[in-house]
């Protein structure tokens, strides 16, 4: 049986001096203060992984959530001190379809980016439960998200930059669903220069749904704030939230009749303010990375493995590559596992540990253009070459020297049947090349060295099993 503990409604995520946050909370919840040595002994016992994070004076260095850590009791049936890992707050939502509203936004980030990140943080929990989250802009909502300052009406003031980052209230309390972020923090997305909004929000939403802290060091619900990418739930997080709400409901499949495509006009249906729909949009870039196919659009990425879209996608690309630009023009993986991203007149390189270098100007590679529209690696295993495309021209590129083989471009007409102005290109396991433009793609035969008969096809149907809209079907006739 899992332990249910009735705790105060508050979770506070602190940025710097955890002892101050801890003492502050003790005062707020009117608990008897502990001596420092007792607090350290307690946490070393129940959170052994943090011993190395204490300095010589026994002070806490890592940022952490300020709620006192209440461990599960010993397992009396076994006679051993076997701990229950996740802990529940004592409450849960009585419904699974929840609405949320964002009242105010941080000054450093656009509303579009904040909305996108909040939706992504909620999706971390909805993809493993039956929960759904819908943003509303008017009227009442179940969840209130606010970026506010100092004293703001709940007797739990923020303290300006640093210190307290955010707090949330548990279900079945007088302020259930309230999640507050300190407006004055240096909020960022996808990097550790400031405070990463995605990771803080996902942690706070776990409390808002009813989870307390976990004693697992790599758990999202660990009290210690760690900048970690890609963001994902640990098994402990998943067990805890599914104990409250159950597993996700299986999707209901729907028939997807195929539409034959002979000729399709280039269409664009960018949805910048919301999560893009793969069935209705074009793509900024497509690339084969680590044997999987990634589609990029407006800061989001779809991940296909073995031709199947993976659960939890689309997701923010920054969950995989911290520091990636919001939009990607082209991407490819080189022979040693580095991943290259191009946007505008710059490029970034992520090494095998996903550490980024850059941005660098495109002129560094030996060409005087302001954008690369597509890039891919093509050829046999022993004779792979990297190609960069822009408009009606292309270059062969050497990632080892970071230079093009010749600053003089070649004509895309060398790739018989491939249109000018492609948006992306990639190669499959059989050696066939794919060229993407708008919502269509052309399959290129490596043996006949030309586009195969019957192309272009629709990306949405062949890769995402979408049914074409009647408007789009009529445009094909």
Swiss-Prot record:
GO terms for cellular component: extracellular matrix; extracellular space. May be involved in the modification of the extracellular matrix during metamorphic apoptosis. This is Stromelysin-3. Expressed in fibroblast cells that are activated by thyroid hormone. High levels in resorbing tail. Hemopexin repeats lie at residues 280-324, 325-369, 370-418, 419-466. Zn(2+) 1 binds at residues 152, 154, 167, 180. Residues 18-85 form a propeptide. Its cofactor is Ca(2+); Zn(2+). Binds 1 Ca(2+) ion per subunit. Keywords: Calcium, Cleavage on pair of basic residues, Collagen degradation, Disulfide bond, Extracellular matrix, Hydrolase, Metal-binding, Metalloprotease, Protease, Repeat, Secreted, Signal, Zinc, Zymogen. Zn(2+) 2 binds at residues 65, 203, 207, 213. Its main location: secreted. It comes from Xenopus laevis (African clawed frog). One of its GO terms (biological process) is proteolysis.
């Amino acid at each position: 049986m899992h332990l249910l503990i009735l705790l105060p409604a508050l979770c506070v995520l602190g940025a710097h001096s955890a002892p101050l946050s801890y003492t502050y909370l003790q005062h707020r919840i009117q608990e008897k203060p502990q001596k420092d040595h007792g607090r350290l002994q307690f946490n070393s016992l129940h959170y052994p992984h943090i011993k190395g994070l204490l300095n010589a004076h026994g002070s806490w260095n890592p940022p952490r959530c300020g709620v006192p850590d209440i461990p599960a009791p010993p397992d009396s049936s076994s006679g051993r001190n076997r701990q229950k890992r996740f802990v529940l707050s004592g409450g849960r939502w009585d419904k699974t379809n929840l609405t949320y509203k964002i009242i105010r936004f941080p000054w450093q980030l656009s509303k579009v980016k904040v909305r996108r990140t909040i939706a992504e943080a909620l999706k971390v929990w909805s993809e493993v439960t039956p929960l759904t989250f819908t943003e509303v802009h008017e009227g009442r909502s179940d969840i209130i998200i606010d970026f506010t300052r100092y004293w703001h009406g709940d007797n739990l003031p923020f303290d300006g930059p640093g210190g307290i980052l955010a707090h949330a209230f548990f279900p079945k309390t007088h302020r259930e669903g309230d999640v507050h972020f300190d407006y004055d923090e240096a909020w960022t997305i996808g990097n550790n220069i400031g405070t990463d909004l995605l990771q803080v929000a996902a942690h706070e939403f776990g409390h808002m749904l009813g989870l307390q802290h976990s004693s697992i060091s790599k758990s999202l619900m660990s009290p210690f704030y760690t900048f970690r990418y890609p963001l994902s739930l640990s098994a402990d997080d998943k067990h805890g939230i599914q104990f409250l709400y159950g597993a996700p409901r299986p999707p209901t499949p729907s028939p997807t009749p195929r539409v034959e495509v002979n000729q399709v006009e280039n269409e664009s249906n960018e949805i910048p303010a919301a999560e893009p729909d793969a069935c209705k949009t074009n793509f900024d870039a497509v690339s084969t990375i680590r044997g999987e196919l990634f589609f990029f659009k407006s800061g989001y990425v779809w991940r296909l493995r073995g031709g199947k879209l993976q659960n939890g996608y689309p997701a923010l690309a920054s969950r995989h590559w911290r520091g990636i630009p919001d939009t990607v023009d082209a991407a490819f993986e080189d022979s040693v596992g580095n991943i290259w991203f191009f946007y505008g007149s710059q490029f970034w390189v992520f090494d095998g540990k996903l550490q980024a270098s850059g941005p660098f100007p495109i002129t560094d590679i030996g060409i005087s253009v302001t954008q690369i529209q597509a890039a891919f690696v093509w050829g046999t295993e022993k004779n792979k070459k990297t190609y960069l495309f822009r408009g009606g021209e292309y270059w062969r590129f050497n990632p080892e020297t970071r230079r093009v083989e010749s600053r003089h471009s070649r004509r895309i007409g060398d790739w018989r049947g491939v249109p000018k102005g492609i948006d992306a290109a990639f190669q499959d396991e059989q050696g066939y090349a794919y060229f993407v433009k708008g919502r269509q793609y052309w399959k290129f035969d490596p043996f006949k060295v030309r586009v195969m008969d019957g192309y272009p096809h629709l990306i949405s149907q062949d890769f995402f099993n979408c049914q074409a809209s009647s408007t789009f079907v009529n445009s094909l006739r």
